[in-house]
Amino acid sequence: MCDYKVSERAYAKLIFHAAKYPHQAVNGLLLAEKTSKGSQVEIVDAIPLFHQCLYVTPMAEVALMLIDAHAEREGLVIAGYYAAPENFYDNQVDKTPAAKIADKIQENFKNACFVVVDNKLMTLQHDRAAIQVFNCPGDSGARWSKAKFTLSQASDTLEGVSLLLKRGAMRDLVDFDNHLDNPDKNWTNDFLNQPLNDLQKLY
């Protein structure tokens, strides 16, 4: 059985992506260290994909190749997929867009996870992790089953994300749709890679 640890950086980016487009579905990829710690996969970064056309398209294929190359340079691996459904009440895998992308990732990384943003927990008073994590345990018989996860420095991360949401930090996040509209915009969102405490000084 595999469980997951989600870094503050990865969590902040995927939450900011969902918060930037609250009335649209969004999706993205999750990156992890190449070597897992025992049965734990540590998700260290998130790369926002799309908020317009979320399905497997030529542009999605290009994005996957670019992100794979980026991960390789950073010593990371594509280890998961995240999605925020458009419908407020949908928080299950079968209700999320472009699940085939998650299936494709799982073919290449057997311990891949599928993170679903729980819209009901997406509030400015961010006191609980607004995600559910799923994986494909080989012995369960289920395609995607709920998995255990921990949020790195949970209390500080939730407090920091909450404060940054209130200050509008999500407006500066760049996804691949934004990058395609303006190639000068950086889809790696390097400015979000600093600790949340330091990031708060910018807003």
From Swiss-Prot:
Could you confirm whether the keyword Membrane appears in this record? yes
Give the UniProt entry's GO cellular component terms: EMC complex; endomembrane system
Primary localisation category: endoplasmic reticulum
**Which stretches make up the MPN domain?**
4-140
Cite the CDD domains for this sequence: MPN_UPF0172
Top-rank lineage group of the source organism: Eukaryota
Biological process per Gene Ontology, one example term = tail-anchored membrane protein insertion into ER membrane
What does the UniProt entry say about where the protein is found?
Endoplasmic reticulum membrane
User: How does this protein lie in the membrane?
Assistant: Peripheral membrane protein
Keywords from UniProt, A to Z, are: Endoplasmic reticulum, Membrane
Q: Which family does it belong to?
A: Belongs to the EMC8/EMC9 family.
The protein's job, in short, is: Part of the endoplasmic reticulum membrane protein complex (EMC) that enables the energy-independent insertion into endoplasmic reticulum membranes of newly synthesized multi-pass membrane proteins like rhodopsins.
Q: What quaternary structure, including any partners, is listed in this protein's UniProt entry?
A: Component of the ER membrane protein complex (EMC).
- Please give the name of this protein: ER membrane protein complex subunit 8/9 homolog
Identify the species of origin.
Drosophila melanogaster
